[in-house]
Amino acid sequence: MTGEDERIEMEIRKRNGKSVPFQQEKIFNAMKKAFDGQGREIGSRELNEILAAVLDNLAAAAPLTVERVQDEVERTLMERGHYEVAKAYILYREKRSALRRVRHTIARTVGDDSLDEVLRRIQMDFTEEVYSLAALQMKFESFCRPGMTEDERAEALTKAAVELTTAEAPKWEFIAARLLNHSFRCRNAQEWEGRGIGDLYGRLRYLTDKGLYGDYILAHYTHEEIAMAEGFLCPERDELFTYSGLDLLLKRYVIQSRSRVPLETPQEMFLGIALHLAMNEGSDRMGWVKRFYDMLSCMEVTMATPTMSNARKPYHQLSSCFVDTVPDSLDGIYRSLDNFAKVSKFGGGMGMYFGKVRAAGSTIRGFQGAAGGVIRWIRLVNDTAVAVDQLGMRQGAVAVYLDAWHRDLPEFLQLRTNNGDDRMKAHDVFPAVCYPDLFWRLAEENIDAPWHLMCPHEILTVKGYALEDYWGTEWEKRYLDCVNDPRIEKRSVTVKDIVRLVLRSAVETGTPFAFNRDSVNRMNPNSHTGMIYCSNLCTEIAQNMAPIEHISTEVHTENGDTVVVTATRPGEFVVCNLASLSLGNLPVEDEAYMERTVETAIRALDNVIDLNFYPLEYARLTNQKYRSIGLGVSGYHHMLAKRGIRWESEEHLAFTDAVFEHINYAAVKADAALAREKGRYALFEGSDWQTGAYFEKRGYTSEKWRALAETVAVQGMRNAYLLAVAPTSSTSILSGTSAGIDPIMKKFFLEEKKGSMLPRVAPELSMDTWWYYKAAHLIDQSWSVRAAGLRQRHIDQAQSMNLYITNDYSMRQVLRLYLEAWRVGVKTIYYVRSKALEVEDCESCSS
C-alpha cells in the first residue's frame, strides 16, 4: 500500500484553502523518513499496516485537511508503541510549521501572496541552517520603512539576500537571484496583461510593431513555429542565475522599452537569439532553434556581448571587434578614423595597426621633417573614442598597434603614463607593440645589444619594400639590410632601453599589450593569402589583414545630377565573431557531449556571418571571404576547482592540454562537416588546412588526427579561422562562472556599484573547492604562462592572457615572464595587471 495498492480516492484541503487529490504515498514516505531519522529499521509490510490504519481512520473524516492527516499519523504511531518516532514526527511538524510562519510573515510584509511559493522552493533547495529564511526576515525587516510601496519592499527583500552573501554562505547569491526574478516576472506579467497580450507570438508582434524587435523574425517564422518555439521555454532555468548575472542581464541584455522597462524574460531573450541564429537553416530549422536555445539557456555556451544584446533587434550588429590596417596617407588615415567611428557607433571595439604610418620628422612629398608622426594621429583616435559614445552608454574602445622597430616607439610607449608632455598623451586608447623574434632573442641573450628604430616610409622609399610586410627569417634579413643602409635614418637605442620603457608602462598602466608577430604568422593557417600585422582590442584575434586602398575619384552625371564617385580596393578589414564554451558548466571529460556542444556553437557562429548587420561594407566583404569565427572558453578556473586541480600543478598542465586538444578536434571536425553541407570558404585551396601543414605544425600525428586531416583535405573547411579565447568579462558573470582563462581575483569580495556593495563569489565556492581557488596575484605566473603555451598549440588564433604581478616583482622578473611566453609560443599578452592597478575590462569582446 505504498501509494499504488488499494488506493483511496479522496481530496485534501491544503493550507491555502485549495482542494487537491489526496496522495497517500506522501504519508508513507513521511513515516519512512521519521523511522530512518531515529535509526529505526522498519519493513515495508509493517509500514503498510500503519498506513492502512491511518487511512481507515481518515476515511470517515470530512473534510480532510493537512492537520487532520498529520494528527492521525501521530496518534497511530503512539498507539502502536512507536513513541520516539512519534516524538520525532511531532518535532518535524513543528519545524515545518516554523518554516511556514516565516514564509508567511515575509510574504505578508512584502504584500505579495505569490511570493510564498518562491520562498517554499528556496527552503526546499537550500536546507543548510546558514540559509535560514529567519535570517533573511531579520535583515529584510531592518530595511523596511513606513510608507514603502510593494515594489520597494520586494527590492528590499532582494537586497537583504544580497547582503547575506558571504564566503561562508555563498549560495545567498542564488537566493537573491530567485527573489529578483520573481519581482521581475510579476512586473513583466503586469506589463503584458495591461496590453492584453498573452502568448509569445503576440508579444513578438507588439515588439516588432514598436520597432524594438527585428521584423525579419516574424517574416521568417510562421505563427505555428513561434508557438512551437514557445514550447521550448524552460522558466526553471532562471534558477541557474546568480544575482549578479541576472541583475546584469535585466539591465543590459533583455529588450527594453524606450522608457527602459524590460519587456522580455531571460528565457525569451535566449529564445529570441536562437530564433535569429537559426533563421536561415533548412528543413530542421526548429531543431536548431531548440539546440541553440538549450546551449544558451543552460549556460553551456555564451555568445559575445554584441550578439547577446543585438540579435533579434532591428540593428543586429553581432560582431565584437574589428581590425583595420591604417594606410600611410591623409585620405587613408581619415578613412580609418571614419571606420572606427562607425564601428564604435554600433558597439564594436577596434584594433588599429599604425605600423605603416610614417614617423615624426619623416618627409612628405620630399619636404624633410614635415611628418608629425603617429602620436598626432593616435590622439585623433583617442578623441574619436571619447566622442562616439554609443548614445551616451559608454565611450568607444580601441587598441593601437605599433612595431617594435618603428621610430616613434619611445613616445608611443609613454601614451598612457602620467609623466611627460600631456600633448603627447592619449589616455583613452590601449597601446600594443608588435615584437619580432629577434627582439626577444636579443633581450634574452644580449640585452645591451643595439636596437635600431626606423621610419617605414623611408624604408619603402629607399629599399622599395615595406619591412612590416615580412616576418621570420625573411624579416630579419631585410631588417639587417636596412640597418646597414646609410641612406635610412636610424634612432639607435639598446634593447634594454626599449624593455625598460615597455615594463615601466606595463607596471604603471597595464599596457602595452604584446603581439608576437613571428609566432602568429608562423602558425597562420592562411599565410598563402596574406599576413597578420596585429591583433584586436583584446588580443585574441589573429587573421589576415590588408589596408583599404584608394583607386580613383571620378565625377559622373546621374539623372541630371553631378555625383562624385570614389573607388576603393576593400583590403582585408578583420571582423571578430565570438562565442565561448563555459567550461565550468560543461562535462569536459565527456567527449561525445563536448563534440555536440562544439558543433552547435560552431554552427551558430557561422550563421552570425550571414545574419549580421555590418557597420561597414569592408567588414562584410572580408567576413564573407574568410568566414572567420572565434570560439573561445570561459570558466577555466571554475573547471579546475570543480575537479580538485590546483593551478600550480603538473596535473593542471596535463589536463588543459587534453581538454583543449579535444576542443580543437571537435571544432575542426564540426567545421569540415559544415563545409560539406554548406560549402567551404573561398580561399581554402592552398591553405594549411588543405595541405595538411596545419596538423603537421601542431604535431597532430595520432591516427584520429590523420584521419581528420584527410577529411579536411577532401571536404574543406567552412571557416578560415576557428578558435580565439576572449576575456568574457561580462558574459562570464551572466553564466555564473570565472572569466576567460584567468584565475579568479579573490574567493569573495565586495564591488561598489552605484552606491551599493555587490558581493562577488567564486563559482560554486564550497569547502570542496575552497583550496583550489588561489587568487590571481598569489599564483606563480610561470604556471599561467606554461599553461597558455600548451593551450596555444590547439588555438589557431590567440588568447586574451593576462599576467598578474605584485609590487614585489622586479623588472627582471616581469621580463622573464615575457620571455617565457615567447619561448613557449604564446602569441599575445593582454594586460599586465599589477595588484595596485585597476584596468578596464573590454565589453565588446566579452563572449
For every predicted segment, state its role.
Residues 189-283, 366-380, 392-396, 401-536, ...:
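Conserved, charged catalytic cores of large soluble enzymes
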